[in-house]
């Protein structure tokens, strides 16, 4: 399967932060049998971001995005993904309730930027963030998979790794031509 990694955020293009996520994800995907054919970085511009996502969905089976899930004005990744897929962008009430509990436990006021974190592409499978507010998601559409994840490298490498390994275990079982059962060891390797 062909994979593409897209990192979002103008701060990457300005050189303000290091793009560790692409390197780590490329290594992980290649270890799990994917061919990472493209890595793209796009700034916080909704039209360019939507265009990049559309192009990726045409040429890759699995598209993983990194960034743009937080509670700031610049976090437009989820909306651009929904536009690229031609699917509605909707509020997930159960995610809003989880977020309200999360912010309340820290005594933080519930405001519009936090509410935006509860919006996802219609039909998305949420991957709750157990160590923060921004959840990731998986969107399966017309045989393609668009995966959105956190920008923070420590969340990706630790909390998210288990979820990602479970996701790839499922994909490996259903993406092989013989459709045979596969096993995943504690390091995520399949046989």
Task: Mark where each language-model region is.
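Glycine-rich phosphate/diphosphate-binding loop of Rossmann-like nucleotide-binding domains
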Residues: 1-39
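Hydrophobic, low-acid, alpha-helix-prone terminal segments
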Residues: 161-171
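Short glycine-rich anion-binding loops that position phosphate/pyrophosphate groups of nucleotides
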Residues: 10-11, 68-71, 151-152
């Amino acid at each position: 399967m062909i994979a593409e990694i897209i990192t979002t955020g103008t701060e990457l293009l300005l050189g303000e932060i290091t793009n560790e996520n692409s390197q780590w994800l490329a290594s992980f995907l290649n270890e799990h049998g994917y061919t990472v054919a493209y890595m793209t970085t796009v700034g916080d511009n909704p039209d360019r971001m939507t265009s990049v996502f559309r192009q990726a969905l045409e040429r890759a089976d699995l598209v993983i995005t990194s960034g743009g899930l937080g509670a700031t004005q610049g976090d437009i990744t989820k909306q651009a993904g929904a536009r690229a897929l031609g699917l509605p962008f909707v509020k997930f009430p159960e995610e809003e309730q989880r977020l309200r509990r999360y912010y309340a436990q820290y005594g933080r006021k519930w405001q519009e930027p936090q509410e935006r974190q509860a919006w996802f592409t219609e039909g998305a499978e949420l991957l709750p963030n157990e160590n923060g507010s921004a959840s990731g998601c998986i969107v399966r559409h017309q045989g393609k998979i668009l995966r959105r994840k956190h920008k923070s490298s420590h969340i990706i490498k630790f909390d998210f790794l288990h979820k990602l390994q479970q996701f790839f275990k499922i994909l490996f079982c259903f993406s092989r031509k013989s459709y045979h059962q596969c096993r995943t060891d504690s390091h995520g390797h399949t046989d």
